Amino acid sequence: MAKLLKDNYDRAYLRRLAAEIAKAEPAFPQQKMLKFIFDSAWEQKELKQRMRHIAQGLQRFLPQDYGTALKSLKQAAPQFGGFEAMFFPDFVEVYGLEDWDLSISALEHFTRYSSSEFAVRPFIVQDQKRMLRQLKSWATSKNEHVRRLASEGSRPRLPWAMALPEFKKDPSPVLPILEKLKADPSEYVRRSVANHLNDISKDHPELVTHLAKQWISGKPETRWIVKHGCRTLLKQGHPGVLALFGYYEPQDLEVQQFQLTPKKVAWSGEVQFEFELVSQASPLGQIRVEYAIDFVRQKGVTSRKVFKLSEGDCAASSKSYRSRYSFKPITTRKYYPGLHRLTILVNGQEMAAREFHLLSETDSAG
């Protein structure tokens, strides 16, 4: 089993953190800090709870003057990186909202080694206009991590993060930031812009469609942003976005020899399916082929999830497909027994469907 991210905060990691802090602040009580962190509730804490607990421990044992504490943290931060080091900006989020200048400088510093994407959001909520000016400034930074923060920190639907309801309602204030970054030389930054665009598409599909039409003829890097940023709209079969990439309503196409087995899928088992896509007027042309499963949820309702099989220009008049879906338990999806439906989609249009039952764990055992 893969190591959980929260378990990276082990004793060796925290001892190293305490030692680095002590280099900047010789009076820092390393053992007291470690005892505080590894308290009786530590094992029950999840990732972000552990992150916050570490930030609280730092605040408790560093000098109580905020600026002095930040100096020590800034000195130690370059020795730590990745998601785990986000307790540095978390310290700013919790204790620095009333000291704007010191805090914004610290967030810019810390994001170079981890990311301040969570910590910057309370500052946006507190003073949106002021923070927008800062975000626009960050978008012009020479450092790719700082430029990414301008986009990632202002995403309206950033996972695990504080929501930004004003940007959900009206994303127009952040569009100039995305415009600045739409052809950024860093893939790290471009991926953030694409994810930001995808966030916006969930509340403002027509706005993103309009932007996509404007951006699609730009540099190859920008075209990638458009494609990745429109992924939700593509899965939803949005006609305007599909057409933008050359995927039009299929004409003279048929799904043939569609087979799905088994009809009764054991708990933790898998469903397999195959079919042939045939054109009556060859070639198949520009096609995006997907399948959707209508999953049973609580109280008998269903929820659809779309999965891509292939896309591109096909010169042949027919093409065979074979795939499977596993119902092995995963943390991001909970399964319920009952009648499911698997549908073949071509360019967003439903072409054929089959039903199958997912058996309960009890029925599967019997």
Residue ranges and their predicted role:
Residues 270-278, 282-298:
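Beta-strand-rich binding/interaction modules
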Residues 259-266:
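Short beta-strand segments of immunoglobulin-like
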Residues 329-331, 345-354:
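Short acidic/polar inter-strand loop motif in beta-rich domains
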